[in-house]
Regions:
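C-terminal outer-membrane/trafficking sorting elements
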Residues: 7-9, 802-847
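N-terminal accessory beta-strand-rich subdomains and adjacent acidic, glycine-rich linkers
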Residues: 22-281
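Solvent-exposed beta-strand/loop surfaces of large extracellular or lumenal domains
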Residues: 79, 83, 93-95, 162-168, ...
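An acidic-aromatic substrate-binding cleft motif
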Residues: 257-332, 336, 340
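Aromatic- and carboxylate-enriched substrate-binding clefts and catalytic-loop regions
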Residues: 342-504
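Carbohydrate-binding surface patches
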Residues: 554-590, 631-634
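C-terminal beta-strand-rich structural cap/linker in extracellular carbohydrate-active enzymes
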Residues: 614-643
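Extracytoplasmic
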Residues: 641-802
């Protein structure tokens, strides 16, 4: 680090100017200026960019129980310094960081107490913090409040998340897991709740964006909220307190040993590209003292709780138990080449160590969920944290997800920092949940991989309509700016195949790289991903980046982001309304030919298509995005990466198909249904026969049926006149849209055998006394390149886990030998010819 210091009382050079009681510091590029005023014993400041006021005169100062440091202050000295430091991090939006700023220090005194105000000016914003030096014989201070304000000079709008209340308050929701909203007037901002908002909050003044947040939240202080005061544009800082019971405390004092510091009050200033690309939060934190960082490895993780739609009991029962469900998802991580598997709530020390050993044999490392208070009789208090992590380290655990902090008081910040230090001692990665937002501490503690503090993807299981494209834009330009965000993307469909999302499949795939997180927890099941069109690109997914740039962005409409890992670029885009996105490829290296692997919206939200194009620097790609749509593409110098097999779509309502009985073609304009219609009223023995199904070769193909059903229904499936299985059970759309709205779409994937040519038929026939669902379309594609040549799969989701617990057979925890069983249809029997049998992609050898 290069640091230069100069007392202002001796000289001021270049960008630094002093006027009597005014002390000015400029950013390194000279465009941004902050002036600290000392007038009649009171401190205040203003900020401008190119002589245009961003922050009008705003008060400064602290109050303590022993002294009021907001008035009657006398100047001791002022100093200026500069910082120009470069550093690397193993995780983040970039690998190379530069911390370049100019610093102003204004030291004042009142009696035997001193107050130092530190300002940092970066090219992309400013920050200030307080220091109470150890002086006058004082060893500590009880701080009670601060006078700091950020008075926006020309307030136009704010994108902010209302504070919902700590666990000690009246609201049961954790404060950082609410939705952001756009406030177009100061009156609506002050009139919502108690006027307090989480940070970060995004402000717009008609020309500039300003992101208000904090940096360097550690054990020495609590975090703060932003409170909208009655004066338009005026934000104050509201502390979260000394202890977790702050909401019921009568004494709100914060005890601080001297020297005492507050976190940095941070304001990023500039256009929306500047907001997205800033690394100011990391720059404001101290460098790490850790010397060995080689063990810190970002990556993608499978996650049973997310893959089972939030740990729903019916799914756990279907797998045969929690342990068996966990193992199925651990094998998903192995199959996808992901380095991690997260074991969530409910694990037991009676089986977990063996689970980790077997996972390691498959090349998967395990992460462990832990309640911040108590879980499985493990004492996670400060006193016993070391012993607990030492034991988990002996089990082979690589990282921990610590949940339910539900507080960000000084007491909790102290406990979190104890966790950071203890986890570093045992080389364990850290993921915080039920917690506050990040504050740049991955510079100090690089093993902090990600954290929650977000209304994330898991909310899809309960409130699918609220996790909208607008919400995703809101958090992209607020919460994810200040640090890694464990959004838990995926959610393409529920375990039973219901497409709960109101966004497109392309949109949900885009979120995998649109958001930044050192551990990307995929909320999906093995069943959904086995034949998913995005499977190949998900196998290659990075979790940390060498470079991140915003190609285009409007916080109320759309965003297109490019992130680089090595020689490959990953470009993702989302939108609120339908649009054509023009991606300028001027960020590619000149002279190199790349291949773009593009996954984009298809004909409707439940449809996604793949295409492959050669591109070079200077090319433009135009990609159509549906409303609530999106895309993801990997641009690589390699032209031979795995791609999904070609899919062919057949509309149910097409005139080439044969309908019989009560079945009818119906016209409907739908978000998730394609082709403008569907086939309904299929009952009482009626048939829907898809004709002219084409196959390039004789062999196994994957049939995906898109259907609409408010309740569970059954039918027969016939391929070329021969029935597949006994009964196909179509599960209810569940919590999708109500009634028989085609926007409530589900899918089912079934292996079938087709003959070469275009004369294959696929028939769905209702039973004589039953009604089948409504049908939108089917798709046909060959098996993936890494699938078995022959695969025998159950034909219904009920039979996927039959009474004899096929999953037990495949689980390493079951003492029964696999070679004692064979497949008969989709069920196992006690005797069979010798050979290899396949269930869910797992080989079963009968000797």
């Amino acid at each position: 680090m290069q640091t230069k210091t100069l007392l202002l009382c001796t000289a001021l050079l270049q960008a630094f100017t002093v006027y009597a009681d005014d002390f000015t510091v400029a950013s390194p590029d000279g465009h941004l200026k902050a002036t600290v005023h000392l007038t009649n014993g009171k401190l205040s400041y203003t900020v401008s960019r190119d002589d245009r006021t961003l922050v009008s005169e705003s008060p400064l100062g602290l109050k303590a129980s022993m002294v009021d440091l907001t008035e009657n202050l006398e100047l001791v000295e002022t100093a200026i310094s500069s910082v120009d430091d470069s550093y690397t991090l193993p995780v983040g939006k970039r690998s190379q960081y530069r911390d370049a700023c100019n610093v102003l220090s204004v030291l004042t005194q009142k009696g035997t107490w001193r107050l130092n105000v530190l300002f940092r000016l970066y090219d992309d914003g400013f920050a200030f913090r307080y220091e109470i030096p150890k002086y006058g014989g004082h060893a500590s201070a009880y701080l009670t409040s601060e006078a700091s304000r950020v008075c926006i000079a020309d307030f136009r709008s704010s994108t902010a998340c209302r504070f919902l209340g700590n666990s000690g308050g009246n609201d049961p929701n954790y404060p950082y897991e609410g939705l952001y909203a756009k406030y177009l007037s100061w009156a609506t901002l002050t009139g919502t709740g108690d006027g307090r908002y989480n940070t970060p909050s995004l402000i717009f003044n008609g020309k500039d964006y300003m992101l208000l947040s904090e940096a360097d939240n550690r054990s020495f202080f609590c975090t703060s909220l932003m409170k909208a005061e009655q004066q338009e544009g005026e934000f104050s800082y509201s502390w979260t307190g000394q202890t977790k019971d702050y909401a019921t405390e009568k004494d709100h004092r914060i005890l601080c040993p001297l020297p005492a510091y507050t976190p940095w009050r941070m304001v990023v200033c500039g256009d929306i590209k500047t907001i997205f690309e800033t690394t100011m939060a990391e720059n404001l934190c101290p460098p790490t003292t850790m010397t060995d960082l080689d063990w810190i490895k970002p990556g993608v993780a499978a996650w049973y709780w997310g893959g089972s739609d939030g740990g729903k009991g019916e799914i756990q029962k279907a797998y045969g138990g929690l342990r068996e469900g966990e193992w199925a998802h651990c094998e998903l991580a192995a199959d996808m080449g992901w380095p991690y598997y997260l074991i969530d709530a409910g694990w037991s020390s009676s089986w977990f160590p063996d689970f980790v050993t077997r996972a390691n044999e498959k090349g998967v490392d395990c992460l462990l969920w832990q309640n911040a208070n108590l879980n499985n009789s493990q004492d996670f208090s400060n006193a016993n944290m070391d012993a607990t992590l030492k034991k988990w380290k002996s089990w082979g655990i690589k990282g921990i997800k610590v949940d339910f902090w539900e507080d960000d008081s000084k007491e909790t910040m102290t406990r979190m920092e104890n966790l950071y230090n203890t986890a570093a001692k045992y080389q364990m990665l850290v993921n915080l949940h039920g917690c506050t937002r990040p504050s740049g501490l991955r510079r100090t503690y690089p093993h902090i991989m990600t954290q929650e503090g977000i209304y994330g993807g898991e909310q899809q299981f309960w409130n699918p309509k609220l996790n909208s494209a607008q919400h995703h834009l809101d958090v992209l330009f607020t919460r994810n700016v200040v640090g890694a965000m464990d959004f838990t993307p995926g959610d393409f469909a529920t375990w039973r195949g219901s497409i709960l999302t109101q966004r497109s499949q392309g949109h949900h795939l885009a979120l995998l790289t649109l958001f930044e997180s050192g551990i990307v927890h995929i909320a999906e099941s093995p069943e959904n991903l086995r034949y998913f069109i995005g499977r190949d690109i998900m196998k290659r997914l990075p979790a940390t980046w060498d470079e991140s740039i915003l190609l285009e962005g409007n916080p109320s409409a759309y965003a297109t982001v490019a992130r680089r890992k090595g020689n490959d670029w990953w470009v993702s885009g989302i939108t609120v309304n339908e649009r054509s996105c023009r991606v300028k490829l001027d960020f590619l290296e000149e002279g190199t030919t790349y291949t773009a692997y593009i996954y984009r919206d298809g004909s409707c939200r439940s449809d996604m298509v793949f295409e492959k194009k050669l591109v070079v620097n200077g090319n433009n790609l135009t990609i159509k995005e549906l409303s609530e749509g999106g895309f993801l593409m990997q641009i690589s110098p390699q032209d031979n990466l795995d791609v999904p097999p070609e899919r062919t779509t057949y509309e149910a309502e097409a005139t080439a198909n044969m309908l019989s009985g009560e079945a009818k073609r119906k016209t409907y304009s739908s978000l998730h249904a394609s082709g403008g219609g569907f086939v309904g009223d299929l009952g009482l023995g009626g048939k829907l026969q898809f004709n002219r199904i084409k196959a390039g070769h004789t062999g196994e193909y994957i049939l995906t049926i898109y259907f609409i059903s408010r309740d569970t229904r059954q039918a027969k499936l016939l391929v070329n006149g021969e029935q597949v299985g006994d009964t196909i059970t179509f599960r209810s759309n569940g919590d999708c849209t109500s009634s028989w709205d085609p926007d409530g779409m589900s899918w089912m994937m079934i292996p079938v055998t087709l003959e070469e040519g275009n004369k294959n038929t696929i028939t769905i026939q209702s039973f004589d006394d039953l009604w089948a669902p409504n049908f939108d379309r089917i798709t046909i594609h060959p098996v993936f390149s890494d699938d078995e040549a022959t695969r025998i799969l159950p034909t219904t989701r009920e039979e996927m886990f039959p009474i004899n617990k096929v999953t037990d057979l495949l689980s390493p925890f079951n003492p029964r030998k696999a070679d004692a069983y064979s497949l008969n249809g989709s069920r196992l029997t006690e005797s069979a010819p010798q050979g290899i049998y396949v269930y869910q992609g797992k080989k079963i050898l009968r000797k």
